[in-house]
Amino acid sequence: MVYTKDLEANWNVFPVSGYHDRLTTKRRIALLIDDGSWKETDSKLVSKDPLKFTAGGSYPERLAQHQKKSGLRDSVVCGHGLMDGLPVSLAIMDFSFMGASMGSVAGEKVTRAIERAIKLKCPCVVVCASGGARMQEGILSLMQMAKTSAALAKLRSAGLPYIAVLTNPTMAGVMASYATLGDVIVAEPGALIGFAGARVIKETTNQDLPDGFQTSEFLLKRGLIDMIIHRKEMKSKLASLLRALAHRKVKVKAVKSRA
């Protein structure tokens, strides 16, 4: 048994098993950003209802329910602050808001976080968590994959670092776009990471899947991610990585062909 107070003091990591439970956006900011340095941006963006989607209730009603329950306007919160003294543009996805589904506002906020990093000439970090695209927005949701990827191409051209932090779960369109485009891709222990779910894959292929399939440990062994970082060490290790990436100098010398 673990008391709630003790669990919260340990950043929602169970002391015996090491299981990383979900963190709220507010707690995630407290974990990663220096006290008093956080400035939220784009907080007033809200989704429209372009498809007049009604399955399972109207989309505006669903949004209102999740906004009231979570205290968030959408599944992404972004802003900038200091991470161990290093200026950084940060976007955080919160699974408590409609499963952190990626809609037009989520994609716009991630894109603006990337563009803000270019403007401020600082690194960008995105903490990823998602169950997939937001079906209530149709193709506008899927469009965010290309939109965010294009923004990251501009960030790379500017020579600025980008780190993707994969938390439980990071699936579908988010995993197939900015979650796997980092200069360094890190994950929390035990995070579920993939495109389609294991059940769907098994039913489609008629094959048994290996133990630990789609976990961060499984994917680390196969090279999809670069590091697994315990939540307690996340801030210090991210800051170290960003400092190393920000000061990289690569010189390429021309080599004459011997042919």
Identify the residue ranges that each predicted region occupies.
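Terminal-region recognition feature
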Residues: M1-I163, P169, L181, E188, ...
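Short glycine-/acidic-enriched loop or helix-start segments at secondary-structure transitions
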Residues: Q136, V174, A196-G197
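Active-site-adjacent loop and "lid" segments of alpha/beta metabolic enzymes
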Residues: G138, R199-D211
